[in-house]
């Protein structure tokens, strides 16, 4: 049986395009001792993948030309020599861009079972996967969110941003403002994602909007964008504010010398504030607990996954490109296949 795979064909100078990838067909891998053979159901895409492609990441081995594109997904276990990954189970794991994969419980972070089979499997890449976990970790473990915080979120219509306000509200937050580009995205921030107010950075003056909505300052900023916007937030911090650094998509395409030079970093000291980044995969041992907690919020109607799904493994390059053209809303993923019937 064949196994279609996407390989890295060239390093992009700007955002990923179809010509940077090559679709090949190989053989389905055979089961190996201590591992599980899985069938890919869904694959997710994330902005950080561009850094892998451009050999710019410090926390992951770089991709060489001809390597399998890396990525996380949801899969069904077809055969297993690993008792922790029984046949028929649904797992979320690092699979790569391919239809079948061998996974190992010793991977870091390890695969984990999606025990919430009453919920759609796609949620394993959104609320019950990297996006939801990133939002929860950033808000609670890093940002120490409080009920009276005035919270601002950049990149609010993206995969992580679509979860931040909802999870913040589930944790007790009262006011969350999101920033996105375009009237439709801003409308959806309020109607679908739990935001109280939306700032359209494509319309009007964003600094004026910040001054109006945060006249007393910002307590917690969940940053997915970086750059000049982060600098503006630094100038508007309340005492003991927290800035959670999740991403910097506004600067991923810029050469180092073209990136923003900060003028307001000293305000961290003046306001006894804190700015901290984190790596979601460092919390892998807690994933099952996070998934159980968020699943309860989904069932209670407190969290609603926002997913942007295309069908077919051949659509993966376009799905990744969408993250840089601003055309996606929510967690961008690809439905690769349906699960096999199991006895």
Question: Residues of each region from the PLM?
Answer:
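Glycine-rich beta-strand-centered segment in the early N-terminal region that forms part
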Residues: 28-45, 53-97
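Short glycine/proline-centered loop/turn elements that form peptide/ligand docking sites
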Residues: 80-84, 178-188, 202, 206, ...
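Mid-domain Rossmann-like dinucleotide-binding core that forms the NAD(H)/NADP(H) cofactor-binding site
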Residues: 124-203
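Short amphipathic alpha-helix with an adjacent loop that forms part of the alpha/beta core around
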Residues: 206-216
């Amino acid at each position: 049986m064949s196994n279609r795979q996407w390989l890295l064909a060239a390093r992009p100078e700007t955002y990923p395009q179809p010509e940077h990838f090559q679709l090949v067909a190989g053989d389905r891998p055979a089961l190996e001792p201590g591992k599980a053979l899985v069938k890919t159901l869904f694959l997710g895409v994330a902005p950080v993948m561009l850094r892998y492609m451009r050999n710019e990441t410090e926390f992951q081995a770089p991709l060489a030309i001809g390597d399998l594109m890396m990525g996380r997904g949801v899969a069904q276990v077809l055969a297993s020599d690993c008792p922790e990954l029984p046949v028929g189970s649904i797992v979320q794991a690092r699979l790569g861009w391919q239809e079948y994969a061998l996974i190992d419980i010793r991977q870091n972070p390890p695969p984990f079972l999606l025990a919430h089979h009453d919920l759609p499997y796609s949620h394993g890449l959104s609320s019950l996967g990297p996006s939801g976990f990133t939002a929860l970790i950033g808000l609670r473990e890093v940002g120490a969110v409080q009920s009276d915080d005035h919270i601002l979120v950049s990149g609010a219509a993206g995969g992580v941003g679509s979860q931040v306000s909802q999870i913040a509200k589930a944790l007790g937050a009262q006011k969350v403002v999101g920033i996105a580009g375009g009237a439709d995205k801003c409308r959806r921030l309020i109607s679908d994602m739990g935001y109280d107010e939306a700032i359209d950075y494509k319309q009007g003056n964003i600094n004026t909007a910040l001054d109006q909505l945060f006249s007393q300052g910002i307590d917690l900023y969940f940053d997915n964008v970086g750059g000049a916007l982060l600098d503006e937030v630094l100038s508007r911090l309340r005492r003991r504010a927290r800035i959670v650094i999740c991403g910097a998509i506004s600067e991923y395409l810029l050469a180092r010398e073209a990136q923003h030079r900060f003028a307001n970093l000293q305000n961290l000291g003046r306001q006894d504030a804190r700015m901290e980044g984190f790596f979601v995969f460092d919390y892998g041992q807690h994933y099952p607990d996070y998934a159980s907690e968020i699943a309860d919020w989904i069932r209670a109607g407190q969290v609603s996954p926002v997913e942007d799904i295309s069908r077919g493994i051949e659509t993966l390059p376009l799905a990744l490109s969408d993250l840089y053209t601003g055309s996606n809303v929510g967690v961008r993923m690809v439905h690769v296949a349906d699960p096999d019937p199991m006895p």
